């Protein structure tokens, strides 16, 4: 009898010990979140996340950082943000092999008019940046419809990222919107932006550092055009292997631009502007300047940043009558090995202030 009781007790204790061992639960296939707090706390619990009509509280970030590898994020309905003067970002996303997309009819609305005061990031209200895409590697962002960012749109610091068919519509900010850059790229490799449609009041694209970056099939309206730079004065001051092609820039201050920082060091190399069409440009159709200091041109170029192996191929179109067709202001010996083919920009003035124009280019 005692032996039987001992056996029963041993079996019971053994079962209890087994039950006490933690069991690792697999992530559910899909989750739908209706609040930013739930999304933040539950984002690693599902392989597919649907964000349904999220109202992000004022002063908070829709935190999608540290997602599990292979997660799909779907924006559904309307995503909105409470008002507060702060730096942001309104959204942040990171992870590997992530897919970010939206359901049919969805929109992400920053309602930037609450912050717009004509000063952008240079004073007035403190405005939140829209979206940090930092360490979003081997991933994709597809088909997002974004409206009214308070200031800059996407801050990109990632590797192997494809951004496809994204619309950023800040057309409502024509009067008071400022510094509403669409895509700011830095310290990134293998970034491909294809089919972007942008209405804004600053750079459609600004590449400050990075390599193997492409921007193609873009439409840029109302801003400052397609820019390399400004390059210099950062921890990473190299831009190389960039192709900007088959795009339109309309009703903008500049068409295509390379700008480097006064008295800084760095490299801009193997950059191609190909098949770019311009219209309604109000300042410069094509501009390369090596004189930026504190965000403004000085008129005096320096040569610490080499701008070499640059291609301008079939950059064509018109500027306004009081604009300048082409302006090239290079430091002594710093702009070399340019290819200049099929460039035809008309309608404006011819600059008398070009300096150190590379062989083959015209100003």
Curated annotation (Swiss-Prot):
Top-level EC class: hydrolase
Signal peptide residue numbers: 1-20
A molecular-function term among this protein's GO annotations: polygalacturonase activity
EC number: 3.2.1.15
UniProt PbH1 repeat ranges: 158-187, 188-209, 210-230, 239-260, 268-290, 302-347
PROSITE patterns named among the record's database cross-references: POLYGALACTURONASE (PS00502)
GO biological process, one term: cell wall organization
Active-site residues annotated for this sequence: 202, 224
UniProt keyword terms in alphabetical order: Cell wall biogenesis/degradation, Disulfide bond, Glycoprotein, Glycosidase, Hydrolase, Repeat, Secreted, Signal, Zymogen
Residues annotated as glycosylated: 162
Highest taxon, organism lineage: Eukaryota
Induction or repression: Expressed in both pectin- and glucose-grown mycelia.
UniProt-annotated location(s): Secreted
Alphabetical list of SMART domains matching this protein: PbH1
Reaction(s) this enzyme catalyzes, per UniProt: (1,4-alpha-D-galacturonosyl)n+m + H2O = (1,4-alpha-D-galacturonosyl)n + (1,4-alpha-D-galacturonosyl)m
Main subcellular location of this protein, as a coarse class: secreted
Propeptide: 21-28
Disulfide pattern: 31-46, 204-220, 330-335, 354-363
GO cellular component term of the entry, any: extracellular region
Keyword Hydrolase: yes
Similarity comment: family membership: Belongs to the glycosyl hydrolase 28 family.
Stated role: Involved in maceration and soft-rotting of plant tissue. Hydrolyzes the 1,4-alpha glycosidic bonds of de-esterified pectate in the smooth region of the plant cell wall.
Stored PANTHER family: ENDOPOLYGALACTURONASE B (PTHR31884:SF13), POLYGALACTURONASE (PTHR31884)
Record-given protein name: Endopolygalacturonase A
């Amino acid at each position: 009898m005692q032996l039987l009781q001992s056996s029963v007790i041993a079996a019971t204790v053994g079962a209890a010990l087994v039950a006490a061992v933690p069991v690792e639960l697999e992530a559910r296939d899909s989750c739908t979140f209706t609040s930013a707090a739930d999304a933040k706390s539950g984002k690693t619990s599902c392989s597919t996340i649907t964000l349904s009509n999220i109202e992000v509280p004022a002063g908070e970030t829709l935190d999608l950082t540290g997602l599990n590898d292979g997660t799909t994020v779907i924006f559904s309905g309307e995503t909105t943000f409470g008002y507060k003067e702060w730096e942001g970002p309104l959204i942040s996303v990171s992870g590997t092999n992530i897919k970010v997309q939206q359901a049919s009819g969805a929109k992400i609305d920053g309602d930037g008019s609450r912050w717009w005061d004509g000063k952008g990031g240079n004073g007035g209200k403190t405005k939140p940046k829209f979206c940090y895409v930092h360490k979003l590697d081997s991933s994709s962002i597809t088909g997002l419809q974004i409206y009214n960012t308070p200031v800059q749109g996407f801050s990109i610091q990632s590797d192997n990222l494809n951004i496809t068919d994204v619309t950023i519509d800040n057309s409502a900010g024509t009067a008071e919107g400022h510094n509403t850059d669409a895509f700011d790229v830095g310290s990134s490799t293998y970034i491909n932006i294809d089919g972007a449609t942008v209405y804004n009041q600053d750079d459609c694209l600004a590449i400050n550092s990075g390599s193997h970056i492409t921007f193609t099939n873009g439409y840029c309206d109302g801003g400052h055009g397609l820019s390399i730079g400004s390059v210099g004065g950062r921890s990473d001051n190299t831009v190389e292997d960039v192709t900007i092609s088959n795009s339109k820039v309309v009703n903008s201050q500049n068409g295509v631009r390379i700008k480097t920082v006064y008295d800084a060091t760095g490299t801009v190399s193997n950059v191609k502007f190909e098949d770019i069409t311009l219209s309604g440009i109000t300042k410069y159709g094509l501009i390369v300047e090596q004189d930026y200091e504190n965000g403004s041109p000085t008129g005096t170029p320096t040569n610490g940043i080499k701008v070499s192996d640059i291609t301008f191929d079939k950059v064509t179109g018109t500027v306004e009558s009081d604009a300048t067709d082409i302006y090239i202001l290079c430091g002594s010996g710093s702009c070399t090995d340019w290819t200049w083919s099929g460039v035809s920009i008309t309608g404006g003035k011819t600059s008398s202030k070009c300096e150190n124009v590379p062989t083959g280019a015209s100003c």
